[in-house]
Structure formats: C-alpha cells, structure tokens
Amino acid sequence: MVSARDLLIPAVTILATPIALGHHSSAPFDGDAVVTIEGTVTQFDFRNPHVYFYVESTDEAGSTVEWEVESDWTTELSRIGWTADSLQPGDRIEVIAHPARNPQRHYMNLISLEKEDGTVLTSWDLRPDEAPPPAVQAAGIAGTWLPDRDFPRFFGLTARLANEKGLAAQESFVETENPASECVPHPLPQRLGNPHVNEIQILDDRVVITAETESEQRIIYMDGRGHPENGELSHHGHSIGWWEGDVLVVETTQFAPHRRGNGFAIPSSPQKRLTERYHLSESRLRLIVDYVLEDPEYFSEPLINSFEWQYAPHMSLIPFSCDLEVARRYLEGLTDDSSSDLTRMRTTCVATGRCE
C-alpha cells in the first residue's frame, strides 16, 4: 500500500533547492538539505507571521532532542487544511524539513509532516492551485484578487538596477536589520507580488485596497487632491489616483525609509515614487498591475514591470495579526555564516535571476 509520505517524495525532491528569499526567516535554513525525523509534538503555536511546533525526538546517540519546526503564515496554511487544532501535544508525527545551517541549533523549515492516522500536512510550497479560474468574469477591477507569487522575480529585477549605494547596502545587510522581525508589513510594490488575498473597493472619492496580511488599509484618494507639501512620511506613502478610461492610475510618494523598501536588502528613501496602472486582462479573469518604481538614491534607473492578480470571487480575506515574539523567534541562534549565505544567495539572484 502506498502511503501519503510516498506520494510526497517527488515534491520533496523538487523542494530540495534554496528557500525563497522573500521568506523573512530563510537565512537560518539549508535549502539544499532535507532531513526526516520522527517524534512527539510538545508544543504547537498557530500564530503569525510563522507557525511553529516543537517535536521531541531521539537522536542517533539515544539522547532526547527537541526540534523547533517553522512553517508559513496561518493565512496560507489555513487554506490548505491547517487549523489551530491540527497538532496537539502528544501527537506522534514524522517530519520532512530543511535543517538549520547552524548544526548546534535543532531548528527546521517544514516541507511536510504525517500523523499516525495518515493525515498529511504540508508547507505552502506544496499547495494545489488555490484559485482555479472562476466561472464568471470580473466586471471591473473591484472585487477579490489573488496575486501571483511573483516577489522573487521582483527581487531579482531590483538587484540589477541598484546603484553603488544600493549595492553597498545590499552587501552590508544583516538579518537583525530586517523590518519583518518587528512586524513591519512588506513594502510596496513587493506586497503586490505576495500570494495573499486582496480586496479592492471603489468608492466615490477613494479606492480602498485591503491586503489580508496587513491591519492597515491602503487609501487611494480620487477627489482631485495632490500630494501634501511636507506631508508625513508613512509605510504606505500618500496615494492619489485617477481614471484613464477603465484604467486606474495611482501615484504614491512620501514613503518612509525602509531597510528593504526596494528589494530583498535594498533600502528605500523618501525620494521613492511608485506609479501603478490597474487594468483587466482581455479575458477579464486577471488584473494587470503595471508599475514604475523610482528611487534615485538607490536605483541607477527606474524599474518598469508588472504584477498579475487572479480573479478570486470565491475567496475571502482571513483576519491577520502579527505576534512580535513569534516574528523575532527565527533570529535566535542566527550565525555569521547565515549572513554570508544570504550574500551568496543575493549574488546568485543578480547573476542568474534565480531568486528562490
């Protein structure tokens, strides 16, 4: 009889590659290695920005070892069968995962697990297509949308356009500088390529975009106002918009400085300017977001590209909150070697475009 674990082997083989750079805690793990352990669950923390559980196992020397296993956001895992009750202390499980780079740390990044009753739970990377083509076309850009997972390509594009100052900042980056460890949301336009549900509302005087991984809505003013002089800098910046036919044009300025505001480790400055054009595809099943990203302090030239979102009227936003203690947990035991590995991963990204 073929077990669920046997069915996962091909996928596990595929996943034995470097972990995505966008994952705020990829630094501690060796994405080229895959290990398997069996043991007993001692703790399960179903919290954001990453789910953790702990497994007590016996090593080759016969000693008892407790492993810390990290997975994805609760919003992602909830869509592939996970709940806050998926694991209980005392459950016997088998875990397939990427181990920590630091051999002294019993720490893993989950690929999949199997419970004694045959239940298999996987990471987000092994999910099926979560937004099959809808039966109806979108009437306009308003509605619920699921972005393609395109942020790794965005990282590669920005790395190529970084000027001398941007490259120097990229090379000097250390993981303790990562704003994600302080629950700071992902910056624009990176978040446009994160695979989390977005809802667009079109009102008389504004457009409201709600991303399920942020507590703050993005407001685009449509009443003809300009950007305020000496306005307050903020994470989302100040956005104004207008219609050109069926195309929503959005201009955003007054961004607060962000250590990763222009890519994986490229900062952004108050000079950052983002222009977006939202329009439906010919099939009316996808939303195209063309954008121009400018920041002369860190870029040699503007980045011109696009993201695509899939129409997903059957999906809804899952409430999100970020737990600061959980957000910082991955920093424990991070070694200097991990930072060196990050630099090598960035170099590969720039040279080959292989950014995950």
Question: Where are these predicted regions, by residue range?
Answer:
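Short, linear, compositionally biased motifs with a strong N-terminal bias
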Residues: 13-14, 31
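Bacterial N-terminal signal peptides that target proteins for export
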Residues: 1-9
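PEST-like low-complexity, intrinsically disordered acidic/proline/serine-rich tracts
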Residues: 27-356
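Boundary at the C-terminal end of the N-terminal hydrophobic targeting segment
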Residues: 20-24
